[in-house]
């Protein structure tokens, strides 16, 4: 055999072996009697992972629309990892709540190594079993209604500064308006650092501290982590000897240093104690011997969980109120002109409804993935039962459920009234039916939900009292979400104009 022929045979053999490696388990769900969505080598069921031409959420939407009327679930693959896309709201509520023990863990734990990623690896979202229970039990009391109420005056003070910052920025703005995400990040950075650590990030000045700059960088996922995620989906055993942190070392060192300095200051100057998150952690250390590392980790969890998602939601609420001036006027009338107490802030049903409706249209988490932790069974519409075993992955199509006309009339339209309790039970009724998952559900629901909602409402109250929000023409008019960002945000950015009232 000539050298050229030998080379071609070797190449062909290699290609065949690679193809077999990538596709050998594509019958994983068919063998169990479950339909499988169209699947391709390398990309699995979600080609947008590689093409980057649209957000992966739209791949999930297409599969959901194709199978939702005939099946309760359908098999899908992320590269070559089998997952069960569950479309039945009753089953979804079981996964989150009633049968939680069988779906206890989030799939993210498969990609995070605690040894190499101290920040995310110790986050309750990633932790499992007793570690998750212990960490959550440390954090939840610090976010109780009484403690959120205790820092509410701090939030009000930050909001008034925020209004003045918006006013100054608007005076200097070009015809393209103000970047709503930049504004929102300035606000959440300031309010989280003040309520959590008792320090100002100087976000509303011309010389902000490095904290604001670092926070704007922190969720820019590195190419190395994306590559690692793809490789581990192709060959899961690689996790045993190769791991890449979601947050880089510079980020970790920066935040740990800030928190250590804040702890030292509190211990050296007890007269500066405040009833905030860090103070609660120090009290827990004194009462129960909480290790200093746990204080650092818990405080980092509070900070990092508190700014990016809340900023995204605030930016999109302002967008939706700008697009719907009649709803903006309703909220403005509801809040009135007098300062609101914490309890009064909790009783603004139309503002709540606007927040919930925005989260329905732009839920930051477009899909959720859970690991099966105990054997479980689901019945399909054809009567066939699928037996799930520990380690299997179930995917919940959050965005698709939120946009399904079967559950939400005219789903692409901003209709806050659907979440008013006077119209059928409010947000909780949708959540209990398994079709509203903006905050998750069950024991692993978002621990910072109460704090985040308070900060959102406090900001919106002050903004709407002082400004009329208008959407700048630079902002697109549809709800197309960004192609690559892993949380749902409007493609092209949100640009707003603020007119003094």
Swiss-Prot record:
Function, as annotated: May be involved in the metabolism of insect hormones and in the breakdown of synthetic insecticides.
This protein's UniProt keywords: Endoplasmic reticulum, Heme, Iron, Membrane, Metal-binding, Microsome, Monooxygenase, Oxidoreductase
GO cellular component: endoplasmic reticulum membrane
Subcellular location, record wording: Endoplasmic reticulum membrane; Microsome membrane
Cofactor(s) it depends on: heme
Entry's family note: Belongs to the cytochrome P450 family.
The protein's Enzyme Commission number: 1.14.-.-
Membrane association type: Peripheral membrane protein
Enzyme class, UniProt record, top EC level: oxidoreductase
Protein name according to UniProt: Probable cytochrome P450 28d2
Positions annotated to bind heme: 446
Principal subcellular localization: endoplasmic reticulum
Matches recorded under Gene3D superfamilies: Cytochrome P450 (1.10.630.10)
Single GO term (MF): iron ion binding
Entries under InterPro entries matching the protein: Cyt_P450, Cyt_P450_CS, Cyt_P450_E_grp-IV, Cyt_P450_sf, Insect_CytP450_Detox
